[in-house]
Amino acid sequence: MNTKIYKRVFALAGELMLAAQERNQINFDNCYSELKQLCDDNENTDKDHPVQWETLADFTDDLPLAISIYEKALLKAEEINSKDFRSSIGFSVASLQVELGEKEQAIENL
């Protein structure tokens, strides 16, 4: 993964956590929008990587939307044959599916 992009994703994740802890919705929305734009700009380029999509999904409040973003991240992890990312993303999807009462689908993702 491009180091500059990784550092920006990491910084945005920290800013998103801080905004969430401070209940600062404006800062949260701004950081989320920037992260989403970064993902969109890099999609299907050599800078595309599952970590940016997984991070975006981590901060997505709408659970079905978060699952769809995780699924995109999972496809990207499969493309680079990353077992670590596939495991992490699969666990996140399964956790959300349990929250949504979709236990059978959750088991399939583990």
Please provide the spans of the model-predicted regions.
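Short terminal alpha-helical segments
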Residues: 3-25
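Structural signature of alpha-solenoid helical repeat junctions
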Residues: 8, 27, 44, 48, ...
